[in-house]
Amino acid sequence: MTEEIVTPLRQRVIEDMRIRGMGEKAQKSHIRAIKDFAAFLGRPPDTATPEDLRAYQLHMTDSGLTPSTFNVRIVALRFFFSMTCGREEMKRYMQFRTEPRKLPVVFSVEEVSDILMAAPGPGLKYRAALSISYGAGLRASEVCNLKISDIDSDRMLIHVELGKGQKDRKVMLSPGLLELLRAWWREARPEGWLFPGKPKINPISPRQLSRAFTSAKHMAGVKKPATLHTLRHSFATHLLEANTDVRVIQVLLGHAKLTTTARYTHVATKTIRDTVSPYEMLAKLQDQTVKRSLE
């Protein structure tokens, strides 16, 4: 397999992303988007005109791209033209599409339990990894990048190093989860990475963890259309249903904006069920009125 040639322009884009502390996943997404634009143009992307951008956006729309994918590419091109090319004015010719607001899928507590118990073996590796995803609300990449030293059993905390947005944070470590992690450590004696891959100098990959989740979900007989990230959604929703302050959940999830966390208020069905409708107060007044009329 021949290595892909890195042009001076691509190298500059990569350097600009590194300077701004962009994560590896975001870097790859930006490069893919810029490559797609270059393929559409048939020439170097830095030579594009406003008309080229208009034609590309029409092409993406006609190709049936989802608003989410469309916007991901626009974000990448805005970065490319403003930061790498120094052509800030080009941002005026790129429009975001409105994304339909979909409520996240959420598991019941029983479904989470069934999935974790069905995690593939041998051993406790994937059960422990998936349990952290739910028990601490971590993203797949955050679970994979955990080190043994990130588990603080004295203060019952997990240190999440450079999560999304390149920010560190602390999350809770429950006694039950600590017990499972200790059982995993006694079984495998991992060094360095909490969940080593092959070779052991590398951690397991998000793709491996996602495959383990899919297998566990299938074995547990859970039919909901869900991904590994659904465990994180469920963590947040179950906390909210237990009356945890939404601002605390925001910190635990590592959300920069409270509005991002607030969407879980729309799926906290237990909270909805337990909330008394003002109609109940009206009904009581009506009952009292009826009783007085009968006296």
What are these regions (language model features)?
Residues M1-E295:
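Conserved catalytic core of the tyrosine transesterase superfamily
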